[in-house]
Amino acid sequence: MTGGQMGADGQDSTDIMALLDNNMLGSMGDVSMGLDAVDESSMTGSFGGSNAQTSTEESVARAENQFNTAANNVPGAGPLPAGPFAQMNLTSAASTLTEFTKRRNWPAKVVEELRDFLQILDANGRIKYASPSILNVTGYSVEEIQDIFLKDLIHPDDRGVFVAELNESIASGNPLRLFYRFKKKDGKFAIFETVGHAHIAGSKFAPNPNNQSPFCQAVFMMARPYPTKNAGLLDSFLEHKIENERLKRRIAELRREEEAENDEAQKQWMQSQEGRSDVTPSEGTGVSSNFFRPSTDRGLTDADRAALNKSLTRENLEGAAGSRPDSLNDKMARYEGASHTETIEMLTGLRYIEGERSRGITTGNASPTLIKGDAGIAIPLERDPRTGDKKKKLKTSEEYVCTDCGTLDSPEWRKGPSGPKTLCNACGLRWAKKEKKRNSSVNHHHAPGPAIDHSMA
């Protein structure tokens, strides 16, 4: 039964197969009941060309309206489910792509939508074509940049590298990839990442018929600003990871140092306890018995105890505090304080802490090196002509602590019950008045009474 008969009778083949008995179908076990593959062209011819064209247009319309809410706002609309319908969906998408490529001047439309700017150079490096996206990236229009040598728009320090890479790519045919600083229309330089290749034409396209060797017809280059947003995020992520790893190692080192110092302090304390086992309490206390010893005396070393036995001056107190082992917080505080200079060294590559460029020490060369020691400056041997005169000794002023009020600032230090210069001016005067009054009262109490003249009586 042909397709034409099917259309004329208006019956489907399934209706005729339903009239057949199962026994009749069983007797045809060895006979193939499958349908052979039919040529698409013959099927199109049998059903008519207008119907096939209509079905193709409908499939393209369905593929284009797949994500259109207005077209999908009908019963049964929307994306096709998975299964056999998915293959039909892929077929329609492929047909849509084919329809796009069949459009007129579609490569130019693709180039217009590029965010990176495309440039075509001749063999001499002159710009023959630039994509419209160059206006957003560099500020130049296509007409302003056409027929200009690209090297004239590159930073002078990068021109040599660009010319060498361009000539090497033209000579060898290898693709080129380089970074250079491009001068924008506002006069500022921006870093660009460029990839490209030279188009080597055949000998039959040579302008000179006498020269039948292949030649470079054009150089295609694609440039974009560097770094991109994703590259910048990746660089910052790597910098944070490196900084985190460095801080972890530093913390581990400080913890090991603190544990070693604690062990050493414990050993010294044990040795001091063993050495003081044969000392009487009166000999061991001495002057320090006047001070209150807290319960944490075990953490003090011999240097701390010796510092407490000295006179209460600011220098001695600071020395006692400095002789104690630093805690982890103190070490981290010092480390955090020096991180600023370390950041400068990491960003600039200079030995900032040692004085390079920070204190005016520079040689002025392209690759300066830090000069240590004698820098070649003439220094006279005799700076002071009065070298024979005796130099006056600088009087080092010691700062005292008042044992009564605890002040450190006083215009004058006076004698107290603990010795000279142990009281401030006010406390010393007050104590002197008390002593004077006490002495006068004692003297008045022990003074002899008035003599009575018995002769007068």
From Swiss-Prot:
Region feature (Disordered): 256-330, 434-457
Compositional bias ranges of the Basic and acidic residues kind: 295-317
InterPro entries membership: GATA_TF, PAS, PAS-like_dom_sf, PAS_fold_3, Znf_GATA, Znf_NHR/GATA
Stretches with biased composition (Polar residues): 268-293
Domain of life the protein comes from: Eukaryota
Keywords: Activator, DNA-binding, Metal-binding, Nucleus, Transcription, Transcription regulation, Zinc, Zinc-finger
Composition bias type Basic residues, residue spans: 434-447
CC annotations in GO: nucleus
Taxonomic lineage: Eukaryota, Fungi, Dikarya, Ascomycota, Pezizomycotina
Subcellular location(s) of the protein: Nucleus
UniProt GO BP: regulation of DNA-templated transcription
Protein name, entry field: Cutinase gene palindrome-binding protein
